[in-house]
């Protein structure tokens, strides 16, 4: 079994992912979605956590061999990033969503030298906006961001467009296609539910029509 499939199976099993194509969730953006993901839950399950962190290390070593520092997005990317940095014996930093309004006013916490090659860790990619904002902040402070890595992506066309426009390489451990295919095969959703889930991937506005 591939890593992407193993992680998809674990996310379903521990209920980090909920699929409700017939009774959709409403995301903060207002989008009606048949899927809801809370990857923070993975931290409570040592086997899943180890699978994820080892997967990150393997992907980063393969895709970004020159990495010199790992950074996590606040807050979801912090625990994963810290574990990855420890496993890889690399420095760790984290990137706030905005600079502190007191003290030194830092947006990056930790020590990042100018030109240091950074990989930014996020737990979930929907449109990619938050991690790309974090990457822009890291670049402003002198980091050489060579890529981003996340546990899971919804594979939304908007995310692909955003990463391409920003010139940022993204790698993920698992993805929406792997997960919904496995979910139907293992009885989490019906064939009709799978059809709705597939429609959502291609058209987030009109998938229920």
UniProtKB/Swiss-Prot annotation:
Catalysed reactions, semicolon-separated: orotidine 5'-phosphate + diphosphate = orotate + 5-phospho-alpha-D-ribose 1-diphosphate
InterPro entries for this protein: OPRT (IPR023031), Or_phspho_trans_dom (IPR004467), PRibTrfase_dom (IPR000836), PRTase-like (IPR029057)
UniProt key word Glycosyltransferase: yes
Record-listed 5-phospho-alpha-D-ribose 1-diphosphate binding positions: 96, 100, 102, 122-130
Cofactor(s) needed: Mg(2+)
GO molecular function: magnesium ion binding; orotate phosphoribosyltransferase activity
Tagged with keyword Glycosyltransferase: yes
EC number assigned by the record: 2.4.2.10
Coiled-coil boundaries: none
Pathway per the UniProt entry: Pyrimidine metabolism; UMP biosynthesis via de novo pathway; UMP from orotate: step 1/2
A single BP term in Gene Ontology: 'de novo' UMP biosynthetic process
Gene3D superfamilies: 3.40.50.2020
Binding-site positions, orotate: 126
EC top class, as a word: transferase
Subunit structure: Homodimer.
Physiological role: Catalyzes the transfer of a ribosyl phosphate group from 5-phosphoribose 1-diphosphate to orotate, leading to the formation of orotidine monophosphate (OMP).
Identification of the protein by name: Orotate phosphoribosyltransferase
Gene: pyrE
